[in-house]
Amino acid sequence: MLRYLFEKIMLILDNYSQKKNFSFLRNLIGKKVEIFFDVGFHEGETTSLANKYFSIKEIHAFEPNPDIPKKFYKRKNNNIFLVNKGVGRKDCKKTFFTNNFSPINSFFRVNKRSKHTRLKIKILSFIYSEKINSRRNNVEIVTLKNYCLKKKY
């Protein structure tokens, strides 16, 4: 329960700053958007917010975490196309580290020697009774350029 609450608080704080960004963008480009790319879809927080601020024809949501699509497909979103890949500078395969605390999933291995990471681990250890574990996943990376060329955009 504490874990769930902590994750939700983190998302609320993130959404607060995202709302300011989306408000600024809407004033700059207007409400209608043809294509929106959500790189790092996670559980759709940014996409949900974007759908509230804009009238979006298509959302292409990239998420390399193999566990996320299972959750996503339970929702009904007819303008969202989930791409179970990461985005990078070149098409390749790369190691993606997933954790039991999903907001810290990353392509970068956790540097347990850094002061920042040690502080994070202390905070998370206080909140979670379980140890933060990483799992390696070999995932596909695509460039946005190549993705768009395949889709003929």
Which residue stretches match the model-derived regions?
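Phosphate/nucleotide-binding beta-alpha loop and adjacent structural elements of enzyme active sites
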Residues: 1-153
